[in-house]
Amino acid sequence: MQSVLVLDFGSQYTQLIARRIRELGIYSEILPYNTTPETIREHAPKAIILSGGPTSVYGESAILPHEGIFSLGLPILGICYGLQAIAKHFGGEVASSAKQEFGRAKMLVSRDGEPESMLFRNIPDSDVWMSHGDKVVNLPDGFRITASSANSEMCALETYGSKGALKVFGLQFHPEVQHTLYGKQLLSNFLIDIAGITPDWSPKHFIDHQIEEIRRTAGDETVICGISGGVDSSVAAVLVSRAIGKNLHCVFVDNGLLRKNEADKVMQFLKHLGLRLTLADASELFLKRLKNVASPEKKRKIIGRTFIQVFEEQLDKEKFLVQGTLYPDVIESVSVKGPSETIKSHHNVGGLPKRMKLKLIEPLRELFKDEVRAVGRELGIAEDILMRHPFPGPGLAVRVLGSVSKERLDILRDADEIFLEELKSSGLYQKVWQAFSVLLPVQSVGVMGDKRTYENVLALRAVESSDGMTADWAQLPHDFLARVSNRIINEVRGINRVAYDISSKPPATIEWE
């Protein structure tokens, strides 16, 4: 299988680059920015992409690629910081820009060069997405300018003439972001036309590869899988089951942090998947350990440790634990020296105890949510399971802000059920990426039945997204929001005020904690 390597310099969009490549039917892998030429040869890619990053190539904290990658004879595309790293390597000059560019910009393609740039073939002047404070101010020898913007004369560069055979390209903007109108076409031009890659990556190919990997990892050992009934754990369980059959033991943990009637619903449809399944009711244990804990990070750590303990109590001879960890989980959990900061530890990653007795199998670790659903369809999983909204591993513990109690959980469950019920009955549930309620650690004064009340404030959250990496708040109809608010205040005891969250990601995250 032909592949592309993305070298990560810490951009928040690195995972999006990988996703856009896969949308073209090409397999992609992400490796650290300082990966050696020897390691790259072992992966045998057909092309290399250098991601963006938050540092300056001329600063003391500059992180630069291994110089040997430019001697491998592979086509290379640098994006934003990647462009600047290329310019520096080949003797160009990068400096701080007097006017920074963040957001949309108009890109003008240079048409007077000979021969025509293969990278910009069939690409008109159009909007692109910028996010930079530095820019190339002196062109490296052997390069030409192929596009410009109002603030970046050298918006795109490429080798030509005697250096043309190197096939090194750079873009100051981000083709992987949806706001760049022809970004996907640019990537296609680079990977298919310039690098000569034949698209051959698909959900079926991924499944076949993972089945081989799982069998090689697990061997004849038995494996335990914590399953929640959500998309990720369900697809992970079925995929592992395809690989090792009855050697997979699934455990559904009722942690007391689930949505209303969730345990019964989950057990019903999981049995239809033909999995060997055990129910472990540990709700009292979780709530006891979470008592008076307000810190979201502490909640996640406690929940991660308790999950593992519960699994270990269900163990017979199992040596491995399956988790439905996805790419967005990893990028929000792992801080690489130099690149992007840790935003929050994820239940499936940073929340696990370091001295865990089980080895991990994470078959979905390199997939985005939409890819997980595509794999699930290939596996024959029912659509009503695949199209469920994402639900956090720590459950409602991170949607009850502040300390968690059974009383506050019940209030949130009742309110959240009304919100989801109204979304489904109004035909809006499948139009949003994720929707949920958050019980705030705030009380407000109200009046009900001529009496003063002092009760909880609830926030409603609904977002639109394609992968969870970025998200816009969903502009739900006002009459719909009014109906939901009215029902919650009148039907749920303990809430007298409802707010709607209109924050996008970034700067906010989708979940509040």
Swiss-Prot record:
MF terms (GO), sorted A to Z: ATP binding; GMP synthase activity
Residues covered by the Glutamine amidotransferase type-1 domain: 3-200
Pathway: Purine metabolism; GMP biosynthesis; GMP from XMP (L-Gln route): step 1/1
Catalysed conversion reaction: XMP + L-glutamine + ATP + H2O = GMP + L-glutamate + AMP + diphosphate + 2 H(+)
Cited Pfam families: GATase (PF00117), GMP_synt_C (PF00958), NAD_synthase (PF02540)
EC number annotated for this UniProt entry: 6.3.5.2
Binding site for ATP: S228, G229, G230, V231, D232, S233, S234
Catalytic residues (positions): C80, H174, E176
Domain GMPS ATP-PPase: 201-388
Alphabetical list of Gene3D superfamilies matching this protein: 3.30.300.10, 3.40.50.880, HUPs
SUPFAM superfamilies, sorted: Adenine nucleotide alpha hydrolases-like, Class I glutamine amidotransferase-like, GMP synthetase C-terminal dimerisation domain
Annotated Gene Ontology cellular component terms: cytosol
InterPro entries: Class_I_gatase-like, GATASE, GMP_synth_C, GMP_synth_GATase, GMP_synthase, GMPS_ATP_PPase_dom, NAD/GMP_synthase, Rossmann-like_a/b/a_fold
Coiled coil: none
Keywords assigned by UniProt, alphabetized: ATP-binding, Glutamine amidotransferase, GMP biosynthesis, Ligase, Nucleotide-binding, Purine biosynthesis
Function: Catalyzes the synthesis of GMP from XMP.
Quaternary structure and partners: Homodimer.
Family annotation (NCBIfam families): guaA_Cterm, guaA_Nterm, PRK00074.1
Name the record gives this protein: GMP synthase [glutamine-hydrolyzing]
